[in-house]
Amino acid sequence: MALKPTMSQLLKNYDLERLAISTVASHTALQILRGAKKYGFRTIAVARGEAVAQFYRQFPFIDEVWVGDFANFRKTAEKLAANNAVFIPHGSYVEYVGWRQALEAPVPTLGCRELLRWEADQFKKMSLLEKAGIPIPRIYKTAEEVEGPVIVKLFGAKGGRGYFVARDRRELAERLKRVTEDYIIQEYLFGVPAYYHYFSSPVYSRLEIFGADIRYESNVDGRTFGWAEPTFVVVGNLPMVLRESLLPTIYTYGVQFLKAVEEAVGCKLAGPFCLESIIKDDMSIVVFEFSGRIVAGTNIYMGYGSPYSVLYFDKPMDMGERIAHEIKEAVKRGKIEHLFT
């Protein structure tokens, strides 16, 4: 990766005793910054406008709240680097600044930054899952190929906005006439949606299953009484504890995904990521999406910890705390460059 030497050199100039953790004031910022403060780091939130900034200023664990320039995020990133800050990406960051700016932002960024480019393209995302040997839904290139119910998804981190389902090729062809953005057509899967939270740890040289959630989507999960068109805009998340017999498969998929990222994308993924799936009634798991960074579903155990974190640390820990723990231990062990790109 072209960016890695630059970020590596930048980190060498950091005062690691005064490290700050920063993120965009949205999505999982409260969880991330609360965890960072609990582990003794300075904290910075970058807000999209003064009204948002005012909300985040009420929290004592956030040391500084800035109003950022998201149209030209490079300036904000340079200011973060000048303040000895590392950056934690999440879905709102990707949506606000776009993957191109995110790739070029001159601030050490947790995880595999190049993976953001792949996340922006639904076809590349599915090809990566396929390379990992993970079961995926059938993908259709045109409406004429469709043989049953499908779901149409727009590119990018949009929280389900603009997604729709169609029962057959005729309905699909009609509805696609109104779509003006890039999209992918996937086989519609029947079963239970489940979103798996993982943490890839360079410090401990292991992959951790950290939690799971179900998304609550409007208005497919709302009170529509059959009067409204199903939509998939995410409004919140519900906790989920998985059948223990499913965990080995879920863990294996995570391992396979990490290997595929390293081989295809060219960098090792450190920190949180998510595989998004349907569990069918025969207990098979089909993965239809991934997020190569922290997901909002981890907010379900903010403050009291993931039910799976006790398996690794013998104490409850939420994902914000887990990120901070990894960074603190990486500083102690001289492995900080393994976390950031």
Curated annotation (Swiss-Prot):
Catalytic activity: 5-amino-1-(5-phospho-beta-D-ribosyl)imidazole-4-carboxamide + formate + ATP = 5-formamido-1-(5-phospho-D-ribosyl)imidazole-4-carboxamide + ADP + phosphate
Family matches, as PROSITE patterns: ATP_GRASP
Positions of 5-amino-1-(5-phospho-beta-D-ribosyl)imidazole-4-carboxamide binding: 27, 92, 237
One family name in Pfam for this protein: DUF1246
GO MF, one annotated term: ligase activity, forming carbon-nitrogen bonds
Cofactors named for this entry: Mg(2+); Mn(2+)
Superkingdom of this protein's organism: Archaea
Cofactor note: Binds 1 Mg(2+) or Mn(2+) ion per subunit.
Documented EC number(s): 6.3.4.23
Binding site for Mg(2+): 276, 289
Pathway(s): Purine metabolism; IMP biosynthesis via de novo pathway; 5-formamido-1-(5-phospho-D-ribosyl)imidazole-4-carboxamide from 5-amino-1-(5-phospho-D-ribosyl)imidazole-4-carboxamide (formate route): step 1/1
Family that this chain belongs to: Belongs to the phosphohexose mutase family.
Name the UniProt record assigns to this protein: 5-formaminoimidazole-4-carboxamide-1-(beta)-D-ribofuranosyl 5'-monophosphate synthetase
Species in which this protein is naturally found: Pyrobaculum aerophilum (strain ATCC 51768 / DSM 7523 / JCM 9630 / CIP 104966 / NBRC 100827 / IM2)
